[in-house]
């Protein structure tokens, strides 16, 4: 583990891997457990829920614990979680809800065991953004052929490739850039559609993560509109038209309905802090 930080809901950052304040280990945070119900020949109702873990903090300057505990308590009082970040990439929302002394403190050393509520049930890591800027023939919404027909033809859909390297279906966020009307795109066998107008200079943001599902439109002047109810949900996950459907593993065909650009960010998810974070300068 190279880095460990706690960021409170108001943006205060507590460095938990500094010279004068550090976490001894992340042992309990590396473990995980699924919640499930036994079925006749297997399991059902599978989920990963919030859990508690112990985090041991050591310091050579005990006074710095006061600032840390102030940030921890402010989040609990506001009922707004902070965020733990490991190695600058793996994150989970968390509360610090209690503490106990690991050793008798003295002016130059203290060890405190904190009780952490891990809110999300998983750790998430954002993968590099994939940018897609499809172009159809011409710059308008129709293809103008060099012969007279009763109507011009609609542009053909553009096929691109999305790569999900996680080995499992991935949560994602997407940003669609205007102008466009009722934008939709297809990945694999699912169509992601929102019945909304995205203005020129604006964008639509779609969040399909386990911790947050939202759809908003941001105008050029910065005004934000909540359009959550305009997302097409079909008959739910697996129906082929669910706007929050996780993206399948591997390479999938991406088909875009128009001339709008898409920024797609997928998330790797782990039940516990990944073991590969052990290979670093500070043992954890």
Per-range role (PLM):
Residues 131-284:
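Intrinsically disordered, low-complexity segments enriched in serine, threonine, and glycine
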Residues 69-76, 126-140:
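Charged, amphipathic alpha-helical segments and their flanking helix caps
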Residues 47-49, 76-78, 106-110, 164-168, ...:
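Solvent-exposed loop and beta-edge segments used for protein-protein assembly and interaction
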Residues 1-50, 89-102:
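Solvent-exposed edge beta-strands and adjacent loop segments
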Residues 22-23, 81-128, 267-270, 283-284:
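Short beta-strand and beta-hairpin "edge-sheet" elements
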Residues 58-101, 253:
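Short, acidic/charged, Gly/Pro-enriched secondary-structure junctions
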Residues 32-63, 108-122, 252:
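Oligomerization/assembly interface segments of phage tail-like spikes and tubes
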Residues 9, 86, 187-189:
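Structural motif
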